[in-house]
C-alpha cells in the first residue's frame, strides 16, 4: 500500500501554538501516514525558539512546535510516522529551505503543509499538492 507523505514547512509547525490545532491528528485524518520534517525546517524552528529578538507569540509557538515534533518522534503508537529528513547529497550551501522542500516533495511524491503563499505558488507551478490552514481552524488539501 502506498503511504501518503507530507512534508512540513516551518510556519506549519507554528500552527499548534498559534491556533491550537493538532496538525498531526489532522494530517492523519486526511490520510497522510508519513510526516516528513526537513532538517533545515528543524534548524529554523530551533532558531526561532532560541532567538533573543523573537518575542511573544511566535517564540512561544516555536517552542510548542519544537516540543510537539520531539514528542511525535518518540511516539510510535499513532497511525502516522514522523521523521526528520536529513539534507541529501546536495552540497549547495545557498539552497534555501523552500527550494529544499520543493526538491524533497518532487523526489518523494509528497504534499507540502505550509502557510507560506509564495511557497504554495511555487509548489503549484511544479504540479505539487499542498495542505494549508483554512479559516484558522482546519487543514485542507488542494
Give the label of every model feature segment.
Residues 23-26, 129-131:
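Glycine-rich, phosphate-binding/catalytic loops in enzymes
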Residues 35, 40-41:
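RNA substrate-binding interface of SAM-dependent RNA methyltransferases
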Residues 1-24, 37:
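Metal-dependent nucleic-acid phosphoesterase active-site entry motif
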Residues 4, 41-142:
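Nuclease catalytic cores that cleave nucleic-acid phosphodiester bonds
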Residues 27-31:
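Short, conserved loop/helix-junction motifs that constitute active-site signature segments
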Amino acid at each position: 500500500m502506498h503511504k501518503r507523505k507530507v512534508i512540513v514547512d516551518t510556519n506549519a509547525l507554528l500552527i499548534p501554538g498559534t491556533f491550537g490545532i493538532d496538525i498531526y491528528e489532522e494530517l492523519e485524518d486526511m490520510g497522510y501516514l508519513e510526516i516528513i520534517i526537513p532538517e533545515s525546517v528543524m534548524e529554523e524552528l530551533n532558531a526561532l525558539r532560541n532567538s533573543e529578538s523573537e518575542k511573544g507569540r511566535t517564540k512561544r509557538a516555536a517552542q510548542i512546535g519544537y516540543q510537539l515534533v520531539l514528542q511525535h518522534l518518540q511516539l510510535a503508537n499513532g497511525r502516522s510516522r514522523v521523521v526528520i529528513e536529513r539534507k541529501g547529497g546536495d552540497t549547495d550551501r545557498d539552497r534555501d529551505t523552500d527550494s529544499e522542500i520543493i526538491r524533497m516533495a518532487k523526489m518523494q511524491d509528497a504534499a507540502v503543509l505550509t502557510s507560506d503563499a509564495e511557497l504554495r505558488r511555487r509548489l503549484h507551478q511544479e504540479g505539487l499538492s499542498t495542505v494549508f490552514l483554512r479559516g484558522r481552524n482546519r487543514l485542507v488539501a488542494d
